Amino acid sequence: MHSSPSRSRRRALLRVAAVAAAPLTGGIALSVRAAGTDVSGVTLVLGDQAGGLRALAEAARVLDGVPYRFRWANFQGAAPLFEAHRAGAIDLAPAGDLPVLTAALGDPALRIVATRVGSPTSLGIVVQPDSPVRTVADLKGRTVVVSSARGSISQYQLYGALREHGLAPTDVDVRFVLPVDAFAAFEAKQIAIWATFDPYYGHVVRRGACVVRDGSGINSGLAFLTSPVDTLNDRAKRAALADVLARLTRAGQWALSHPADYASVYASLTRLPPDAAADIVRRAALAQRSVSRADIDVLQRVADRAAADAILPKRVDVASIAIPNVSAT
């Protein structure tokens, strides 16, 4: 009997996640109970983008000695991250507002489980140092490379910037390229104009790229953590996930209280230059909280704007996919 394409794809993504993941961490799974639930047999796969969440957790050492197993699965952008999410290959995923909405349209099992508060200055439209482009108006008739894919926070920022100057998306030629590939091409001057986000944004700016417009006044600055329904419906996994979320909240508090220490660890773990790492950490979505009504309202406005701009094919009802409080039971 032949496997269905969807099953084969899921197995392939599980293998990718396993290769990308770090070795199992947390020591031997002891018979320890969290919130009355035995989590000793649980293994969580924690998705990540460009190593940011892992760097935070390891810098603050919040996952040391947990009573369950976990491993990291790192992806270069939201598109491949949410492909793994949809396949059930990961239990937790961090992403910006619009990628979460984009993923939700293709994945009815996706749920938002936490809010992370950052800065809209963590992304922007950049050009080469010698570029004649200096304002958004100068983009008209030119090619703009957007990372990572359709439905990214950078696409939302680009469209918002164009609208400010009376331009339409059709006034530029938009091309989508994954950020690692786009970074290499921008460094080689094969890309002239790039709409991207941290850490890639912070890195190229420190290397001399000129900022045409950042996300201030356009993007929300919010990011989110999501989890699949299957994970949330598994009592032991949900208990372990609730514990991870609480620990990540503490990690964010530590990083905000020790910015220099965190920047140093972040630079070491990601191999970014210290100056770029310091910039990125200062803008990063570190403060974490349960999803509030205000967060839902902000994300709903993003969803409605993105649908009006045809970035999203239809409206997303944010309240229907948000879990205000992920408890262990």
Predicted regions located by residue number:
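N-terminal secretory signal peptides
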Residues: M1-S8, V16-P23
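Short, glycine-/small- and polar/acidic-enriched structural segments
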Residues: A35-H165, R175, A192-A195, C210-N219
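Pocket-lining segment of extracytoplasmic ligand-binding domains
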Residues: V180-S268
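Secondary-structure end/capping motifs
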Residues: D234-I311
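Conserved C-terminal helix/tail region of periplasmic/extracytoplasmic solute-binding proteins
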Residues: A306-T329
